[in-house]
Amino acid sequence: MFGLEIYDYHSAGGKNVILAYVEKLSKQEQLEIYDVRGEIRRSGLDAFEKLDTRQLRGKLWEIKLSQNRIMYVIMNKDAVAFLHICKKQKGKAEKQDLDKALNRARKENLL
């Protein structure tokens, strides 16, 4: 199995909002996220079988990490789009975070 290319969401000004968020986290949280990204790049779709994932709505899914959530859409057999990342606060995704990820997916024509 070949790995997937990861496309992070960028703001209108060109800022990579995913990596900007990650850079503000503790070193331990950063390592956890970079490990997940590395596994996806190496193992492709098989990586998602090993991760704690959950379908949120339609093509929008989330990866649940120890302290954070990454909301994503599988674009095709070769690529995944990371649309939003946030702190885990409750047992489920917060409405504002879900709405933000859905809006970004629509803006990028991923839904």
Residue ranges, per PLM feature:
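Short, conserved beta-strand/beta-arch hydrophobic-aromatic motifs that form part
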Residues: 84
